[in-house]
From Swiss-Prot:
Cofactor note: Binds 1 zinc ion per subunit.
Name this polypeptide is given: Phosphoheptose isomerase
Gene3D superfamilies with a match to the protein in the record: Glucose-6-phosphate isomerase like protein, domain 1
Alphabetized InterPro entries for the sequence: GmhA/DiaA, Phosphoheptose_Isoase, SIS_dom, SIS_dom_sf, SIS_GmhA/DiaA_subfam
NCBIfam families found in the cross-reference section: gmhA (TIGR00441), PRK00414.1 (NF001628)
Main location: cytoplasm
BP term (GO), one: carbohydrate metabolic process
Organism expressing this protein natively: Tolumonas auensis (strain DSM 9187 / NBRC 110442 / TA 4)
Entry EC no(s): 5.3.1.28
Pfam family, one: SIS_2
Length: 192
């Protein structure tokens, strides 16, 4: 009954991934991001990740893979998802949702840390505000975006952009693959 729809969804996902892979800059950006994050962790820094909705879940997944494990046993790495419900509700109520991530970076971020922002549109104002706060504190910025990069295009030290202009779920599917590759490369960098 739905077999053709299922196949169509898988083929569309396959094409979005093929288009992403075909751009060598995407591969280079993933490598640069992993190297940047690994250098911060090696020097005692931390990675703070953030996103909204499904991207928030991806930010939590990234931090969990750092503090827990990916494929192999190894020491835990300093990864924090900006996801504490009391922080999010307090800052949203007292300052506005635009500041939920930046306020956290202002409180616990240090020069040499890294912020990972995830936004399928590249237009999430709270992540843009966090980028501004991060840069003011000497925190390096990596962003995962989609479409044309939105307002975040050009703001980060490293942008990994999925140039897909359809539904956001296709972008999220590639973001999670990128996250897993980042973790794998970070582990390799820190194993030497």
């Amino acid at each position: 009954m739905y077999q053709e729809l299922i196949k169509q969804e898988l083929v569309t996902a396959q094409q979005a991934l093929a288009d992403f892979i075909a751009d060598a800059e995407n591969i280079n950006a993933i490598e640069r991001a992993a190297t940047l994050i690994a250098a911060s962790l090696r020097d005692g820094g931390k990675v703070m990740s953030c996103g909204n909705g499904g991207s928030h879940c991806d930010a939590m997944h990234f931090a969990e893979e750092l503090t827990g494990r990916y494929r192999e046993d190894r020491p835990g790495y300093a990864g924090i998802a900006i996801s504490d419900p009391s922080h999010l509700s307090c800052v949203s109520n007292d300052y506005g949702y635009q500041y939920v991530f930046s306020r956290y970076l202002e409180a616990v971020g240090r020069p040499g840390d890294v912020m990972l922002g995830i936004s399928t549109s590249g237009n999430s104002q709270n992540i843009i505000t966090a980028i501004e706060s991060a840069k003011a504190k000497g925190i390096k910025v990596v962003v995962l975006t989609g479409k044309d990069g939105g307002k975040m295009a050009g703001l980060a030290d490293v942008e990994i952009r999925v140039p897909y202009f359809g539904y956001a779920d296709r972008i999220q599917e590639i973001h999670i693959k990128v996250i897993h590759i980042l973790i794998m490369l970070i582990e390799k960098e820190l194993a030497v």
